[in-house]
């Protein structure tokens, strides 16, 4: 992700409620699980997507802690 995309993503997250952030986190965790499964099976072409999703999960958790 480029810096502009990251800033847009974080700004979008800050506009969500706690419940919506939790839902977004669960969606990203499910995607990460699926990506890891594909990587283990040797079917994953975009290996960089694993790190990207992990960082997105961290961003969601950061925004959640900011709201508390």
UniProtKB/Swiss-Prot annotation:
Q: Please list the GO terms describing molecular function.
A: structural constituent of ribosome
Q: Name one GO biological process term.
A: translation
Q: What CDD domains does the database record attribute to this sequence?
A: Ribosomal_L29_HIP
Specify the superkingdom.
Bacteria
Q: Name one GO cellular component term.
A: cytosolic large ribosomal subunit
What's a Pfam family this protein contains? Ribosomal_L29
Signal peptide from the UniProt entry: none
> Which key words tag this protein in UniProt?
Ribonucleoprotein, Ribosomal protein
NCBIfam families with a match to the protein in the record: L29
Membership in a protein family: Belongs to the universal ribosomal protein uL29 family.
Name by which UniProt lists this protein: Large ribosomal subunit protein uL29
Report the source organism.
Answer: Streptococcus uberis (strain ATCC BAA-854 / 0140J)
């Amino acid at each position: 992700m480029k810096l502009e995309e990251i800033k847009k993503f974080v700004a979008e997250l800050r506009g969500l409620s706690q419940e919506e952030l939790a839902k977004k986190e669960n969606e990203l965790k499910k995607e990460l699980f699926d990506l890891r499964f594909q990587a283990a099976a040797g079917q994953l072409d975009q290996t960089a997507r694993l790190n990207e999703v992990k960082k997105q999960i961290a961003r969601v958790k950061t925004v959640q802690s900011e709201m508390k």
